[in-house]
Curated annotation (Swiss-Prot):
<dbReference type="GO" id="GO:0030145">
    <property type="term" value="F:manganese ion binding"/>
</dbReference>
<comment type="similarity">
    <text>Belongs to the peptidase M17 family.</text>
</comment>
<protein>
    <recommendedName>
        <fullName>Probable cytosol aminopeptidase</fullName>
        <ecNumber>3.4.11.1</ecNumber>
        <ecNumber>3.4.11.10</ecNumber>
    </recommendedName>
</protein>
<feature type="binding site">
    <location>
        <position position="335"/>
    </location>
    <ligand>
        <name>Mn(2+) 1</name>
    </ligand>
</feature>
<dbReference type="GO" id="GO:0070006">
    <property type="term" value="F:metalloaminopeptidase activity"/>
</dbReference>
<feature type="binding site">
    <location>
        <position position="333"/>
    </location>
    <ligand>
        <name>Mn(2+) 1</name>
    </ligand>
</feature>
<dbReference type="InterPro" id="IPR000819">
    <property type="entry name" value="Peptidase_M17_C"/>
</dbReference>
<feature type="binding site">
    <location>
        <position position="251"/>
    </location>
    <ligand>
        <name>Mn(2+) 2</name>
    </ligand>
</feature>
<dbReference type="InterPro" id="IPR043472">
    <property type="entry name" value="Macro_dom-like"/>
</dbReference>
<keyword id="KW-0645">Protease</keyword>
<keyword id="KW-0963">Cytoplasm</keyword>
<feature type="binding site">
    <location>
        <position position="274"/>
    </location>
    <ligand>
        <name>Mn(2+) 2</name>
    </ligand>
</feature>
<keyword id="KW-0031">Aminopeptidase</keyword>
<dbReference type="InterPro" id="IPR008283">
    <property type="entry name" value="Peptidase_M17_N"/>
</dbReference>
<dbReference type="GO" id="GO:0005737">
    <property type="term" value="C:cytoplasm"/>
</dbReference>
<keyword id="KW-0464">Manganese</keyword>
<keyword id="KW-0378">Hydrolase</keyword>
Length: 488
């Protein structure tokens, strides 16, 4: 999307749609007005009253703009950054659906001007995302966007917002790919293709290297498929030499049948989304490079296809992981923790990071506990967890911290191995899965995000204008924003 900004007079702006925001009960539009416009705006306000989620419009005869389109923000005291982001997305979709070539949006002058410019960009870019790779009829070009306002820092804010939304779009695009078009090998090739800058490089370990390296979890889960596993490693060195990196790990099961412990057939097609954690990591890495952040970040994506077959791993097997610890397999559909454990241990040992964050569509139990709008979070470090919570509030990608202690750790102890890949019955499934991961690392500050409920739009997902159907890219904005804050 082509985006520009200035502080020009809205009444003199030549555009197909002059757009703005309205507070509930207000007589005018926030940040939008001028000679000849005020009466037209009042007319449009009368059609929606500024109620959140409502769109109204009116023609603008005799003016440079062709029409005015207004989005309601709700009561003045309840306006949030995500409210502006959401309604900007609603305006963008309205403009696209009308087939207009361009639109101008007036920043409402409620929050920081540069922040408002970024929110408008995020809402519009994310709302207009379309996955049409396999359709004969493509979506076509997005309408051009001009932001009225945003202050002297608008240009930088817009550029940064576009870098982050490009990362989200990249993650969504990979996650939405069907399993026949995105096995582990192709996911690895997509990561290699992404690494074009001088500060970023990609290494992809194949099956022989994984066997030799002792990645027992990745090998076990992937051995039932003709599509061999990969370990994708993306290194971004934007910080000082010797500066400890932050390691990001993402689960990428390109299709999960459950293996021998096979899943029900209903909705199994959605298991293409079991790679969303890895796609999130790659999206963050893309955003970090585009932002040129002065930090060192490592993205590690273990990728497998979990299939049943004569060579598949079985319930009852004992698998030796990269850490040297052994895992008793009680259910082959609890595979994500096995590949993540290998990647976490490898990342900590090789890179000695300052922090580790992992992302995974790990447990259905997380959806039972938290639904489809909040990700589960488990951490071994209170200060780190609070920083991630703060970042999530800024991007409206909500997380909820769950406890972890010795009682939970004891629930994955095995009588025949160091641990088991299932907890006890249906109790605390999200936490016992995280406990398995905690066993893979030492004392490095660590946050685990279970995004099973938030990674793609599901029936109970709260519909937001900037989250169209399919993968959401959850976590890209959150962690890209967190890393940006750490770099400042």
């Amino acid at each position: 999307m082509k985006i520009t900004a200035d502080a020009s007079d809205p009444a003199k702006r030549k555009t197909a749609a002059l757009c703005g925001f309205v507070l509930e009960g207000a007589a005018g539009a926030a940040g939008l007005g001028g000679p000849g416009l005020d009466d037209l705006i009042k007319e449009a306000i009368g059609k929606n009253g500024g109620k959140k989620g409502r769109i109204s419009m009116t023609g603008t005869p005799g003016m440079p703009s062709e029409r005015v389109i207004l989005a309601g923000l709700g009561p003045a005291g309840k306006v949030t950054s995500d409210g502006i982001r959401s309604e900007a997305g609603r305006l963008a979709r309205q403009v696209r659906d009308m087939g207009l070539a361009d639109f101008a949006v007036a920043a409402p002058s409620i929050l920081d001007p540069a922040e408002e410019a970024a929110l408008i960009v995020e809402g519009a870019e994310l709302a207009l995302y379309s996955f049409d790779e396999f359709k004969a009829e493509k979506a076509g070009n997005s309408p051009r966007l001009h932001i009225l306002g945003g202050g002297p820092s608008a240009a930088r804010a817009i550029k940064d917002a576009q870098s982050i939304t490009a990362g989200v779009a990249f993650a969504r695009g990979l996650a939405n790919m069907p399993p026949n078009e995105c096995p582990p090998d192709k996911l690895g090739r997509a990561a290699v293709k992404m690494c074009t800058g001088k500060k970023m490089r990609c290494i992809v370990l194949k099956k022989p290297e994984l066997k030799k390296g002792g990645f027992g979890g990745i090998i076990a889960v992937g051995q039932g498929s003709s599509n061999e596993p990969r370990l994708i490693i993306v290194e971004y060195n934007g910080g000082k030499k010797g500066q400890k990196p932050i390691v990001l790990v993402g689960k990428a099961v390109t299709f999960d049948t459950g293996g021998i412990s096979i899943k029900p057939g209903e909705k199994m097609d959605e298991m293409k989304f079991d790679k969303c954690g890895g796609c999130t990591v790659l999206g963050i890495m893309k955003a970090v490079e585009d932002l040129a952040l002065p930090v060192n970040v490592i993205g590690i994506v273990p990728s497998v296809e979990n299939m049943p077959g004569g060579s598949s791993y079985r319930p009852g097997d004992i698998v030796k992981l990269y850490s040297g610890k052994t895992a008793e397999i009680l259910n082959t559909d609890a595979e994500g923790r096995l590949i993540l454990a290998d990647a976490l241990s490898y990342g900590e040992k090789k890179y000695a990071p300052s922090e580790i964050i992992d992302f995974a569509t790990l447990t259905g139990a997380c959806i039972v506990a938290l639904g489809n709008n909040v990700a589960g979070m488990v951490s071994n470090d209170d200060a780190f967890a609070k920083r991630i919570e703060g970042a999530s509030e800024r991007t409206a990608e909500e997380v909820w911290r769950l406890p972890i202690n010795d009682d939970y750790m004891s629930m994955i102890k095995s009588e025949v191995a160091d641990m088991r890949n299932l907890g006890m019955g249906r109790a605390a499934g999200t936490i016992t899965a995280a406990a398995f991961l905690k066993n893979a690392i030492g004392d490095t500050p660590w946050v685990h995000l279970d995004i099973a409920g938030t990674a793609w739009n599901q029936p109970a997902t709260k519909k937001k204008p900037y989250n169209p159907g399919g993968a959401t890219g959850f976590g890209v904005r959150l962690v890209a924003g967190y890393l940006k804050g750490r770099a400042q």
